Amino acid sequence: MQPIQYQTDLTPYNTFGLRAKAQAFIALKHADELRDIVRLPEFNRDTVLWLGGGSNILLMKDYAGLVVHMENKGIREIECSDGLVYIEAQAGEIWHDFVLHTVELGLSGLENLSLIPGTVGASPVQNIGAYGVEVKDVIHSVRCFDLDTETFVELSNADCDFAYRESLFKQEGKGRYVIVSVVFALKENFVPNLGYGDLAAAVAQLSQGREATAKDVSDAVCAIRNSKLPNHNVLGNVGSFFKNPVVSAEKAADLLQQYPSMPRYPQPDGSVKLAAGWLIDQCRLKGHQIGGAAVHDRQALVLVNKNNASAQDVHQLAQYVCNTVFTQFQVELHAEPNWLPTSYSL
């Protein structure tokens, strides 16, 4: 087990680059170390922060508790069956690196999720998604450390209660399960999912008439994301800041009468998902700045750390965006990242 550090600077551990310190900090290199970590005097399951890539958190002030940085690495193929390859990745693996690894193996299923920041362990929590694919589509099971019993358990896909940007790990399982690895069921034969946005055109341009591959899709997704989204190493951000709101069919129809070009995505239950970025853009908020935080000038869905933003700058800007969108559309926006402490949640 690694030694505990105290008053550790967390700025390098959150992609928005907010300045905060951890009262105590320890790096986890192997899942088995969890048995020792939970017995540390600094450990309190009600206040511990399990930290991955830091791409889905907003640190509003110094963290008054233990931060466990998940650095366990490793990828292994478990089995092949009926055209599927089951691959286990440890929670500390960088998500994009893992996606590229599966693409290089000729496997299909994760290519649409290329270049999403964060770690493998965080992917089921948020049920990350992009370009018509959600990670729940390819997760077979999730291995966790159960803090109630202090044993390792394996949860099936169904056990995880996946929904849009939701899972068991954000609801009743929050504070109980520590994700240590994820098993993915990936296809040996490439089945493209190109029904979202401008992805099909980008893939066609790359493949130039030949049959497209998973690598083509991954490369196209990377190119599109790089053209729209800032690199968090250059300009601090947490990717998409707001969830795409889901409204009733009646509300969507009313809005469509006023805004005929409004993007909308009918859902199986009859509701309609709207594009948060489009709503924000219609309010002419690109480039709007409060303190050091700003709405990105090319992608309205992204808030950025433009000039040493304080936590209060980010909170005020997010609140302003939500209020402005609600005033114009009567649609509520909700933030994707987690506010820490949660009392700051919008």
Predicted feature locations:
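Beta-rich strand-turn-strand
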Residues: 107, 311-314
